[in-house]
Amino acid sequence: MKKWKQRGFAFVLALSLTTGMLTGAQAAVSKETLNEAVQDTAEYMYRTVQDPQVGSIGGEWAVLGLARSGYDVPDSYYQDYYATVEAYVKACDGKLHDKKYTEYSRVIVALSSIGKDARNVGGYDLTKPLGDYDKTIWQGLNGPIWALIALDSRDYPMPENPGAETQATRQMYIDRILECQLPDGGWSLFGGTSAASSGDGVSDPDITGMALQALAKYQDQPAVAKAT
């Protein structure tokens, strides 16, 4: 059952990110078939995740998938989730994780999908940690990838982080992704970084898809257009 849940979450997340980009000959299936699949999976997700918490499976990805799917979800579902996030953020004094800054990005994306401003959640600015370049990229390429996706999810300005050793900019995250592109054209979690091991020289479809999503907004930059 756990595998099916994970597949369902991943399916709706992928569809929620790509549905709006498929048109005409680009679509492998008809729009009606795609919409039916989205609705069926969203219904399953809604029935399965009745009380979303702060976390990956059963949390932000479920909220994002449902919000982007167009499925008819009661407003109270999102209101209760936001209240849960607010209580969680207050309980940990605004510090979601001391190492993995994708924790902030994931929550930001989910909040943006339901129309909430991540810059004031229980009095805490959840975008601020993403202003720390070194800490954001520490966990691998998913750090800068999701920082860009999160900040662009609501067109947040780049947050100032006085405590950062290196203040981040959007361009720095873009450049980080580009410089880590592998010879085969894709990306992997640690490929192109100092932490890379022998297996990181081969593209990972998951990370590659994330990288393309993060760079999609920046196609006006020649280096981005060439890389993608």
Language model features: what each stretch is:
Residues M1-F11:
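Bacterial N-terminal signal peptides that target proteins for export
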Residues V12-G20:
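Bacterial N-terminal signal peptides
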Residues T19-T33:
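Sec-dependent signal peptide cleavage junction
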Residues V29-M45:
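Short N-terminal segments immediately surrounding and downstream of signal-peptide cleavage
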Residues E32, T48, E86-D93:
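Intrinsically disordered, low-complexity N-terminal segments that are enriched in acidic
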Residues T48-P74, K95-R119, T136-R170, D175, ...:
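An alpha-helical repeat/solenoid feature that recognizes helix-turn-helix modules
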Residues S76-V89, N120-D134, P162-R170:
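Alpha-helical repeat scaffolds
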